[in-house]
């Protein structure tokens, strides 16, 4: 199997925390960072290990910002995004491929010492912190007409947000342009973000998450879908849970 960017980010965060715990170096001031469209499994890993997790916008300048504002107060221990970018240390303020390659090799060696493969480690993480399947849909709309279409799509989503996704009830709507969070009970909160961004997120009662944003570099709008399956318990569950999650994703795409 090919391990995707969400899975590598998940393994990086898991290993960094486990290694620090083993060495007695995990501190209350340590923190991780992930982009808002990256898997929520990382949030579970951080939560269960009492490590602060910060969500930021897509792009490593936002991860670098979190490092900068915490210098001398808290320690950054890792951060990344769903598209394979990761920064395991705080010296470089951008995605660091060489360091990430070294880290994944270290993780593979660590797993091998335990008689495991990276796949075995992935399954172990899912069993402990919950299974999720992520899928990105890119809708390409070239030219000025396409740009207008994408703009209208976002306008329509704001005017008529979905009430259900693939049969699951939407219970929370986040709008990073208005910096508002709306809940199904009618309550409204403010989003604590450093700037506005043209991103929408919808969360369902079964922890399905869908994020929508126009690409900043290409003529397309991107839909990031994440589906959970709490029935995942062991390696034998992987194919079944993946197939069920893909069925759910297909239902959401419709």
What positions do the PLM features span?
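Cysteine protease catalytic core and zymogen-processing segment of caspase-like enzymes
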Residues: 1-20
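Phosphate-binding and adjacent anionic-ligand microenvironments
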Residues: 1, 19-213, 220-224, 231-238, ...
């Amino acid at each position: 199997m090919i391990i995707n960017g969400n899975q590598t980010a998940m393994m990086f965060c898991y290993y960094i925390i486990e290694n620090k715990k083993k060495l007695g170096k995990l501190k209350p001031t340590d923190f991780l960072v992930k982009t808002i469209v990256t898997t929520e499994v990382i949030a579970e890993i951080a939560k269960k290990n009492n490590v602060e997790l910060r969500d930021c916008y897509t792009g490593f300048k936002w991860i670098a910002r979190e490092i900068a504002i915490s210098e001398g107060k808290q320690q950054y221990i890792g951060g990344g995004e769903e598209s394979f970018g990761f920064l395991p240390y705080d010296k470089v303020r951008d995605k660091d491929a060489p360091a990430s390659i070294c880290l994944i090799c270290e993780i593979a060696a660590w797993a091998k010492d335990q008689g495991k493969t990276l796949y075995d480690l992935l399954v172990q993480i899912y069993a402990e912190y919950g299974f999720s399947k992520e899928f990105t849909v890119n809708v390409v709309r070239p030219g000025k007409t396409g740009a207008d279409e994408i703009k209208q799509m976002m306008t329509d989503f704001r005017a008529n947000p979905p009430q259900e996704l693939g049969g699951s009830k939407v219970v929370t709507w986040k709008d990073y342009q208005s910096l508002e969070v709306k809940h199904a009970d009618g309550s409204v909160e403010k989003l604590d973000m450093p700037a506005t961004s043209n991103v929408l997120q919808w969360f369902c009662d079964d922890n399905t998450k869908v994020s929508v944003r126009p690409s900043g570099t290409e003529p397309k709008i991107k839909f990031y879908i994440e589906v959970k399956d709490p029935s995942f318990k062991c390696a034998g569950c992987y194919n079944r849970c993946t197939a069920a999650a893909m069925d759910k994703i297909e239902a959401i795409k419709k």
